[in-house]
C-alpha cells in the first residue's frame, strides 16, 4: 500500500467521502478533480476493485453533469489499465461504461424535453465540425426565432456529448474477448443513435471506426501469452460480428447511404467467407434484399435481378412465407429480370473486358460461381415455375416479351396495356422506366434488321408508349437512341438536317452480335458467313454421288479412329489414375509428416508455455505474499497512529485536558483511553444533573399551559358545532333544488322525444333490411376465415408433433449409441483386466521357477563315482523332455550356454 498522503490518508473511502463533502458545498469541479487524481494514480493497481468501482461511478456522474467528456474518457482508459489484471476488473469496466452511456442518453432526453424540439439532420450537419466565425455571424443575424436558437443550444451540445461518449466507449472496449458482449451492445446503441437522429456523417465515421477495429483483429499477430485476444475461429464471436455488420447494413440502407451500404456488404461477405459456420437463412435473405436495393440505386439492373433471384431462393424455403408475399417477391424478381437490357453488340468475348474485375467482385458478393446473365436468369424463372406465383399483370408482360412473337410495330400497344395494370402497384411501378428502356432497345435492334434508312420521326413514334405515367417525350426517346449507340446496343447514325436515320450493317465484324438478338430475316452478315459452309455441304454431296464407296471408306476410317481413341483413352485413364494415386500417397505422407512436425512443435510450445506460466505464477504469488505482509504491517501501524490521534483529538475537544498532538510518543492508546473514560464519566454526570432540572421545569410549564387553555377549548367546541349545523342545512337545500331541476328537465326531454317515435320505428326497419345481406356476407367471411385459421392451426400442430416425434426418435437413437459405446468400453476393460490377470500369473510362475533354479545352483556339489561312458543316443534319451521356460532360456543365454 502506498504511504499516507500529507493531507489525508490515501484510501478510497477517504477520497469518496472527501468528494461527497465537496459536492455538498457546491464545489463539483473540485470533487471531479479529486476523483480523477485517484483514478489516474498508479497506486490504485493493488487496491480492490469493489472499493474503486463506486469512485469511478461517481466520477462518471460528475463528468456527465459537468459535460467533461475528455476527462471521462481519460479516466476510463486509465481505470481499465489499472484494473484489467484484477479478478473482476473487466466486469467493473463494463458496468461503468454502460452507466456512462446511460447517463449521457438520459441527459440528452432531458434536454430534448426541456427544449421541446425535434432534432433534425438539417440543424447540424457534422457534430465534430467546429463553429466558424461566419456561422456565428449568420446565426446572429438570421431571422430564426430566438427561442428556437435557445432550444438548439440546449440540445446540440448533449447530442455531441453522447456521440463522443459512444466513440470513447467503443475505443475502450475494442479487441478484448471478455468485453465482446458489451462492445456489441454499445455498437448497436451507436447504430440506433445514428438512425434515430438521422446522423449520416457520424454513421460514416462509426463504420470506419468499426472497420478499423475489425482490421486490427484480422491483422494482429497473436503472441503466445496474449490475454483476452479476439478469436475469429470461435463461432459465437464470428456470429456476434456478423450481427453487427448486418445491423450496420440495415441502418445504412435506411439512411440511404449507398456507398456505405456497399462497404458494409463487403464487410459482411468477408465475415461470411471467414466463418466456419453458415449464417442463418433469415440473415442471408436480409443480406440479398439490401444488396438488391443497393444495385437498384447504382443502376446495375443485371446484378439487381441476380440479388432478387438469390433472395427469392431463400425466401421460398421459409416456412413462414405466405402466398401474398411469395407473389409479391416473385413479381419483383420477374420485373427486375425483364428490366435487364440485351447484351451489348460490341462486347466481344475475345477481348479483355474492362469490367471483369468489377463483375468478379460483384459475383463473389452474391456467392455465385459465374457472372450472371439475362438468359440464365430467365431460364431459372422458367425452370423453377416462378411464373405460377407472380401477379397476373406481370405474367402477362412476361408472355408478351419472352413467349409471344416480339413484333416491333405492334409491341407498343400490348406493352402499354400491361403497364397501365402494373402502375397500380407502387412497388412494381418503379420498374417501368427500366422496362421501357430495355423494350425500346430490343425494338430498335429488330428494326435495324429490316430497314437500312428510316425517318427519325418514325423511330421516335415507335418509342413513345402512351397511356402510362412514365411515357417518354420525343427528346427522351432520341436521347435513349443515342445512349444505345454509345453503349453498343445499336449501330446507326442520325442526320438531323434531313431527319434520316441510317442503320449500319457490318457483315464482316458482326459475327458475334447476331446471336444476341432475335432474327426477323437473314442479315447480310449471315449471308457472307454462310457461303463457305454452303460450298462445303455442296462439295460433300457431290463426292457422295461421284464415288459411292467414299462414304464406306469414311465410315471405316472413323470406326478405326474411334477404336484407337477408346483404347488410348482407357490407357490414359489408367495412367492418370495411377498418377493420382501416387500423388495422393505422396501428399498423404507429406501431410502426415507435417502434421507430426506441427504436433511436436505444438507440444514443445505447450510445455514451454506451461513451464513459463508456472514460473510466472510462482513469482506472482511470492510477490503478492510479500506485498500482503508489507501491507498488513503498514496498515497495523497506521491504525495504531490513527487511533492514538483520534483519542487525543477527542480529549482536546472536551477542553479539560490539553494534549500536544505532535508529541504523543510517550503515550499509548491504553493511557489515552483511560483519560477519555474519566472525562466521559464526568461529562455524563453533569449532563444527567442538567437533564433532571430541565425535566422538572418543563413539567410545571406544561401543566400551567393546559390549565389556562381549558376554558378556550370549550367555547371553540360550541362554535364549531353551530357552524357544522348551518353548513349541513345549506348543503341539504342545494341538493334538493338540484334534484327538482334535473327531474323537470328529464320530463321535458321525454315529451320532445315522444313525438319522433312513429317516424323512428319505420326508419329502423328499413335500415335493418338494407344491411341484412351485408351482415350475412360479413358473417360468412368471418366463418370462412375461422375455418381457414382452424385448418392452418391443424397443419401447424401436425408438423409440430411430427418434429417432436423425429426429435424423440433421434434422442432415443443417440441414447442407444451411447449405451452401445459404454457396453463396448466395458467389454474392452474386462478383457484388459483378464489379460492383466493372466500376465500376473505368468510373472508369478516365472519368478517361482527363477527362485527354484537359484536355490538348486546354491546347493554344494557331492562327489559321485565317475560313470562309465554311454553312447550319445542314450545320453540324449536320458535328458528330461520338459521344455525350458523363457526365464531359464534367458539365464542360460547370460551364462553363454545354448538354450536348447
Curated annotation (Swiss-Prot):
GO terms for biological process: formation of cytoplasmic translation initiation complex; translation reinitiation. One of its GO terms (cellular component) is eukaryotic 48S preinitiation complex. Keywords: Coiled coil, Cytoplasm, Initiation factor, Protein biosynthesis, RNA-binding. Belongs to the eIF-3 subunit A family. Residues 808-853 have a biased composition (Basic and acidic residues). Residues 871-883 have a biased composition (Low complexity). It comes from the Eukaryota. Residues 326-508 form the PCI domain. It is found in: Cytoplasm. Component of the eukaryotic translation initiation factor 3 (eIF-3) complex. It comes from Debaryomyces hansenii (strain ATCC 36239 / CBS 767 / BCRC 21394 / JCM 1990 / NBRC 0083 / IGC 2968). PANTHER family: EUKARYOTIC TRANSLATION INITIATION FACTOR 3 SUBUNIT A (PTHR14005:SF0), EUKARYOTIC TRANSLATION INITIATION FACTOR 3, THETA SUBUNIT (PTHR14005). This is Eukaryotic translation initiation factor 3 subunit A.
Amino acid at each position: 500500500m502506498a504511504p499516507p498522503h500529507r493531507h489525508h490518508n490515501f484510501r478510497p473511502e477517504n477520497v469518496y467521502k472527501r468528494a461527497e463533502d465537496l459536492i455538498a458545498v457546491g464545489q463539483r469541479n473540485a470533487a471531479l478533480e479529486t476523483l480523477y487524481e485517484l483514478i489516474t494514480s498508479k497506486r490504485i493497481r493493488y487496491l480492490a476493485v469493489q472499493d474503486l468501482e463506486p469512485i469511478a461511478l461517481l466520477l462518471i456522474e460528475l463528468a456527465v453533469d459537468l459535460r467533461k467528456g475528455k476527462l471521462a474518457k481519460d479516466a476510463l482508459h486509465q481505470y481499465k489499465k489499472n484494473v484489467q489484471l484484477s479478478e473482476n476488473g473487466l466486469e467493473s469496466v463494463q458496468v461503468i461504461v454502460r452507466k456512462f452511456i446511460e447517463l449521457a442518453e438520459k441527459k440528452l432526453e432531458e434536454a430534448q424535453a426541456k427544449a421541446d424540439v425535434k432534432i433534425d439532420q438539417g440543424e447540424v450537419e457534422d457534430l465534430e465540425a467546429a463553429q466558424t466565425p461566419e456561422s456565428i455571424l449568420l446565426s446572429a443575424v438570421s431571422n430564426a426565432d430566438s427561442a428556437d436558437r435557445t432550444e438548439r443550444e440546449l440540445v446540440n451540445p448533449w447530442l455531441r456529448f453522447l456521440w463522443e461518449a459512444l466513440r470513447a466507449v467503443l475505443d475502450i472496449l475494442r479487441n478484448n474477448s471478455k468485453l465482446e458482449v458489451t462492445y456489441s451492445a454499445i455498437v448497436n446503441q451507436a447504430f440506433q443513435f445514428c438512425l434515430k437522429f438521422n446522423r449520416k456523417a457520424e454513421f460514416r465515421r462509426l463504420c470506419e471506426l468499426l472497420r478499423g477495429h475489425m482490421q486490427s483483429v484480422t491483422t494482429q499477430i497473436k503472441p503466445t501469452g496474449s490475454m483476452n485476444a479476439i478469436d475469429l475461429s470461435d463461432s459465437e464471436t464470428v456470429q456476434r460480428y456478423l450481427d453487427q455488420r448486418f445491423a450496420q447494413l440495415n441502418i445504412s440502407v435506411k439512411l440511404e447511404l449507398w456507398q456505405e451500404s456497399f462497404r458494409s456488404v463487403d464487410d459482411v461477405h468477408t465475415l461470411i467467407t471467414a466463418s466456419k459456420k453458415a449464417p442463418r437463412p433469415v440473415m442471408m435473405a436480409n443480406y440479398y434484399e439490401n444488396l438488391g436495393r443497393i444495385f437498384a440505386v447504382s443502376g446495375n439492373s443485371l446484378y439487381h435481378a441476380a440479388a432478387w433471384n438469390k433472395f427469392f431462393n431463400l425466401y421460398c424455403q421459409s416456412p413462414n412465407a405466405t402466398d401474398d408475399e411469395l407473389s409479391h417477391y416473385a413479381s419483383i424478381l420477374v420485373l427486375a429480370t425483364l428490366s435487364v437490357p440485351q447484351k451489348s453488340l460490341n462486347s466481344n468475348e475475345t477481348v479483355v473486358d474492362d469490367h471483369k474485375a468489377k463483375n468478379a467482385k460483384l459475383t463473389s458478393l452474391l456467392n455465385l460461381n459465374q457472372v450472371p446473365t439475362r438468359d440464365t436468369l430467365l431460364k431459372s424463372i422458367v425452370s423453377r415455375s416462378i411464373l405460377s406465383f407472380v401477379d397476373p399483370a406481370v405474367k402477362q408482360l412476361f408472355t408478351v416479351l419472352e413467349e409471344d412473337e416480339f413484333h416491333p410495330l405492334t409491341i407498343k400497344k400490348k406493352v402499354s396495356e400491361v403497364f397501365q395494370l402494373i402502375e397500380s402497384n407502387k412497388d412494381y411501378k418503379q420498374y417501368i422506366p427500366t422496362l421501357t428502356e430495355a423494350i425500346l432497345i430490343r425494338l430498335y435492334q429488330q428494326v435495324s434488321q429490316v430497314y437500312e434508312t428510316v425517318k427519325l420521326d418514325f423511330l421516335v413514334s415507335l418509342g413513345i408508349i402512351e397511356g402510362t405515367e412514365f411515357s417518354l417525350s420525343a427528346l427522351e426517346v432520341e436521347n435513349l437512341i443515342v445512349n444505345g449507340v454509345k453503349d453498343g446496343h445499336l449501330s446507326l447514325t442520325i442526320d438531323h438536317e434531313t431527319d434520316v436515320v441510317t442503320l449500319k450493317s457490318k457483315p464482316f465484324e458482326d459475327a458475334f452480335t447476331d446471336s444476341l438478338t432475335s432474327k426477323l430475316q437473314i442479315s447480310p452478315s449471315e449471308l457472307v458467313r454462310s457461303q463457305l459452309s454452303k460450298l462445303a455441304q455442296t462439295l460433300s454431296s457431290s463426292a457422295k454421288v461421284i464415288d459411292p464407296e467414299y462414304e464406306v471408306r469414311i465410315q471405316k476410317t472413323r470406326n478405326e479412329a474411334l477404336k484407337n481413341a477408346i483404347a488410348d483413352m482407357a490407357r490414359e485413364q489408367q495412367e492418370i489414375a495411377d498418377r493420382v494415386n501416387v500423388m495422393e500417397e505422396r501428399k498423404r505422407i507429406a501431410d502426415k509428416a507435417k502434421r507430426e512436425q506441427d504436433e511436436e512443435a505444438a507440444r514443445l510450445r505447450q510445455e514451454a508455455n506451461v513451464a513459463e506460466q508456472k514460473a510466472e505464477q510462482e513469482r506472482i504469488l511470492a510477490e503478492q505474499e510479500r506485498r500482503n505482509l508489507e501491507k498488513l504491517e503498514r496498515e497495523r501501524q497506521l491504525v495504531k497512529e490513527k487511533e492514538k490521534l483520534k483519542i487525543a483529538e477527542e480529549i482536546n475537544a472536551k477542553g479539560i485536558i490539553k494534549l500536544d498532538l505532535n508529541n504523543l510518543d510517550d503515550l499509548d492508546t491504553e493511557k489515552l483511553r483511560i483519560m477519555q473514560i474519566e472525562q466521559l464519566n464526568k461529562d455524563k454526570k453533569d449532563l444527567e444533573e442538567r437533564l433532571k432540572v430541565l425535566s422538572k421545569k418543563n413539567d410545571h410549564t406544561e401543566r400551567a399551559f393546559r390549565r389556562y387553555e381549558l376554558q378556550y377549548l370549550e367555547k371553540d367546541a360550541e362554535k364549531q358545532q353551530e357552524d357544522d349545523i348551518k353548513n349541513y342545512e345549506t348543503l341539504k337545500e342545494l341538493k334538493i333544488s338540484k334534484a327538482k331541476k334535473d327531474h323537470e328537465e328529464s320530463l321535458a326531454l321525454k315529451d320532445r322525444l315522444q313525438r319522433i317515435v312513429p317516424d323512428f320505428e319505420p326508419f329502423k326497419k328499413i335500415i335493418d333490411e338494407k344491411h341484412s345481406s351485408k351482415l350475412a356476407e360479413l358473417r360468412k367471411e368471418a366463418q370462412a376465415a375461422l375455418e381457414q385459421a382452424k385448418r392452418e392451426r391443424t397443419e401447424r400442430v401436425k408438423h409440430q408433433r411430427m418434429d417432436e416425434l423425429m426429435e424423440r426418435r433421434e434422442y432415443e437413437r443417440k441414447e442407444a449409441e451411447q449405451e452401445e459405446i459404454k457396453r463396448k468400453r466395458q467389454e474392452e476393460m474386462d478383457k484388459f483386466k483378464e489379460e492383466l490377470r493372466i500376465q500376473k500369473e505368468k510373472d508369478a510362475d516365472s519368478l517361482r521357477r527363477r527362485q527354484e533354479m537359484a536355490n538348486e545352483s546354491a546347493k554344494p556339489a557331492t562327489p559321485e563315482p565317475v560313470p562309465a561312458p554311454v553312447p550319445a543316443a542314450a545320453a540324449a534319451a536320458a535328458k528330461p523332455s520338459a521344455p525350458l521356460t523363457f526365464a531359464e532360456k534367458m539365464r542360460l543365454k547370460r551364462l553363454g550356454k545354448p538354450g536348447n
